[in-house]
Amino acid sequence: MSFSSDTKDELARIYPEEEESKIAELAALIRTIGSISMYGNGKISLTFTTENASVARLVFKLIKDLFGIIPETMVRRGRYLKKTLSYLIFVPDTKIAEEILGKVKILNYEKGHIKLNYGIDQKILKNSKAKKAYLRGAFLGGGSISDPEKAYHMEFITHNLEHGKDLSKLINSFDLNSKVIARKNNYVVYLKEGEQIVDVLNIIGAHSALLNLENIRVYKEMRNNVNRIVNCETANLTKTINASLRQIESINYIKETVGLDYLPPNLKEVAELRINYPDLSLKELGQMLVPPVGKSGVNHRLRKIEEISKKLKERRVQ
């Protein structure tokens, strides 16, 4: 199973205790996996469709507990290449469908006409628990989260822009920074920062998923730090080797053209050590001098030797 599926299975096992939270979570599920059918004779039906059996059981229980009815259920296998199972929860009775939609503030009657509310009615977000329940339902119905080993990305898909904006506003009320974009015929509310995704998982109650993601984040950060250290050390080693080769080349040129006695005693001493010990660092070379010289002092002398070699080459060209 994917990280996203595991997260949904964990969330579907959380059952809200307060009626306000049950209503809020059901409202979000209707917005994301529900469809309302309106017929010419004034009849209305409500259908939920999901490929997650845990989510289907949650919808069934919420309707049963809130409205005291047993909704119809159906399992359907996909055709052609997609053989996955779909679970349908069906409320065919107009009166009950209207009661459910009215309770979650999606359906209103104005002057004898039915009016659909596409945004999130603030009346169902009565407290912090209800807000969290709504976000949990929105994730169960239309949410997904990428495998944190590959990328940090969490999104909620909705069919309506007004709902998408309200959902983003609800998420951001928890000091987060979600954004809304259009994707084909849908709207996507998304977050891309690891810390913010962790916060959302905490808000909706996915604590096991949160711990797994945090463990992966820590591992990735440690791995990146190790890689940075290795790359830095490799770069420094390469730089040191190149400098050593350049210094030895300069010393050999002086030796072959005018001899090392051409150099002042302090430079000659360093030159001989560098040729005899090409792998030593500047610090180690300095410790072998009499008296010992610091790293910067050795570096200064070797630069002087390179300058002398350069001048000798220029004279030869002239």
UniProtKB/Swiss-Prot annotation:
User: According to the lineage, what is the superkingdom?
Assistant: Bacteria
Q: Which organism is it from?
A: Thermoanaerobacter sp. (strain X514)
A Pfam family cross-referenced in the UniProt record is: HTH_WhiA
User: What is the official name of this protein in its record?
Assistant: Probable cell division protein WhiA
| Tagged with keyword Cell division | yes
> Which keywords appear in this protein's UniProt record, sorted alphabetically?
Cell cycle, Cell division, DNA-binding
Molecular function GO terms recorded = DNA binding
Looking at the UniProt feature table, which residue ranges are given for the DNA-binding region?
A: 281-314
Q: Carries keyword Cell membrane?
A: no
InterPro entries, per this entry?
A: Homing_endonucl, Sporu_reg_WhiA_N_dom, Sporulation_regulator_WhiA, Sporulation_regulator_WhiA_C, WhiA_LAGLIDADG_dom
Described purpose of this protein according to its UniProt entry: Involved in cell division and chromosome segregation.
Tell me which Gene Ontology terms the entry assigns under biological process.
Answer: cell division; regulation of sporulation
Recorded family membership: Belongs to the WhiA family.
